[in-house]
């Protein structure tokens, strides 16, 4: 309240970008359609206390990654609104998709789906994973935020070296 002019004002908080939640996906999940370990929904960390209108979109200036799949370069393309990123190899196979969307409760999430195995460097002190960073922003009331980044860690499907007993039946 402004005593001098008799004016009441209300300050409204707008859309706020918190910290997005990173996640891990496992290439082992590519071999078993019953598993969901290669497709995950995680929070973008957006709060909107006053239900302001806003849009979320990827930074569409990022068009490639240094990572590869089957020895091939991976390039990114986006839908018109910038909410779906599709990563394809040189041979046009889709390696993964990432979608910015609302979950069933209305919260902003990203949906990462790994479709093809990615190349990993071996002998890196047992490290068989790497991070894929994704940048996004929010536009509200004509203003676009700075980019925020979430990471998806891709874990290689490394076989376990264990003793196994195998029985074979031969013709007699």
Where are these regions (language model features)?
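Acidic/polar, solvent-exposed loop/turn segments
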Residues: 1-172
């Amino acid at each position: 309240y402004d005593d001098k002019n008799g004016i009441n004002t209300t300050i409204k908080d707008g859309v706020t970008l918190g910290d997005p939640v990173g996640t891990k996906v496992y290439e082992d999940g590519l071999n078993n359609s019953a598993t969901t370990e290669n497709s995950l929904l995680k929070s973008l960390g957006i709060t909107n206390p006053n239900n302001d209108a806003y849009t979320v979109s990827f930074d569409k200036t990022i068009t490639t990654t240094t990572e590869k799949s089957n020895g091939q370069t991976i390039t990114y393309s986006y839908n018109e609104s910038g909410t779906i990123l599709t990563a394809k190899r040189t041979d046009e196979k889709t390696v993964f998709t990432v979608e910015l969307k609302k979950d069933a409760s209305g919260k902003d999430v990203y949906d990462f789906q790994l479709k093809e195995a990615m190349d990993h460097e071996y002998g890196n002190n047992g490290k068989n994973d790497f991070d894929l960073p994704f940048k996004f922003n929010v536009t509200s009331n004509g203003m676009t935020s700075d980019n925020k980044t979430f990471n998806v860690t891709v874990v290689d499907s490394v076989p376990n070296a264990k003793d196994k007993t195998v029985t074979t039946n031969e013709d007699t």
